[in-house]
């Protein structure tokens, strides 16, 4: 699964947890869908067995992604090796050693999430200059050995955007997350030209995936891709 520039921009809908979510995602037809696995604090949490059951009805055209937060390496590898998921997305404090140990199990496609610095961190001159904070962060993201990086405002699924101009520091393809949805997705694509977009809470109503919002979000990205040709 090679990573090239997002042409067309790829689409990932994340946080599926119910059979009806699978019905909706099959209708919307994004490129990827995400399952949050073994993260009890998430309202979208699923168990490996739940994902296996949901996966059976997922369209083969949609690539399933497992989203993890500091999960034991062997558990992630097991789900990749048995085909439950095809991509591992790391959303915790996983480091280069973690990625190295995961790759020892096989040739896997790995996405590593990075939290974009908040204004208070950037302006905290007591520790580092704003320029140093940004350069250190960008250097870490650019040097990640993951196949793809994801930029978010925090732990994922918060529905809040980050300062988009900071993404200009990244010199590699990236997946854009954090408050991206039907209402602002065209603006985000025009400004940042990401490899792909990752949406979760923005395609929900009352904490549940919303079929109409999922269809609208995917439709707007497809339209943007078509107009870009």
Q: What is each residue range found by the language model?
A:
Residues 24-30, 58:
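A short, Lys/Arg-enriched amphipathic alpha-helix followed by its capping loop at the start of a domain
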